[in-house]
Amino acid sequence: MANFIKSINFGYAKDNLLRDTARMAAIESVKFFKNSFVKGGFIDTSLKQWAGKQSPLGGKKLMYGTGALMQSIQKTEETAQRVVVSSDTPYSSLHNDGGIITVTAQMKKFWWAQYYKFAGKTKTTGRGRQSNSAGNRRLNAKAEYCKRMALMKVGSKIKIPQRQFIGESQTLMAELDRQLHTKIAEYWENS
C-alpha cells in the first residue's frame, strides 16, 4: 500500500489568497457603499441617517436624482495591500463631507429658469383663474422654492449638510474579515 503525501506550495497559496481576497474586498466595498443610497445613510457601527431634504424638488429618494452619484462609486486601486474605492463626480466630496457653496450669477439664472418652468405649468379654470388642485399646489411649492433660491444675493452662502456614503466602516471591515476567514477555510479544505 502506497502512502500519499500531500504537499502544499505555500508561496502559490499565499499569492492566490492575496489576489482573491483583494478582488473580493473591492467588490464587497463597492457594493457596501452603493447600499448607503438604498438605506438612506452610512453604516459605520450603526446606521447614520442622512439629513432630510428641504427642497420640494426631486424624487422621493434623497441623493438619487439621476443615480449618477451612486453609479460613480468604483474601485480605483486594487493591490494585495489595499483597496481604494472612490467616486469621480465633481460634487461627490461636497455631499460626502458637507460644505458651503457660494451663490453665483449663473446659479441665479438657473433658478429663474426653473421658476418660470414650474410657474408656467399650472392649470387654469374655465374662467382663466388658477385652479386650486393638488397638482397646482405642488407646482406652486416648487416654483416658490426656485424663486427663493433665485432671489438670493450673489456671494451669499448655502450650507450643504454632510451625507456620507463612502468612508471608514467597522461594519464593512467585520464583514470582510468574516469573508476572509471563510475563504481561507475553503482553500485549506480544497487543497
Label every model-predicted segment.
Residues 1-191:
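Short, Lys/Arg-rich flexible segments
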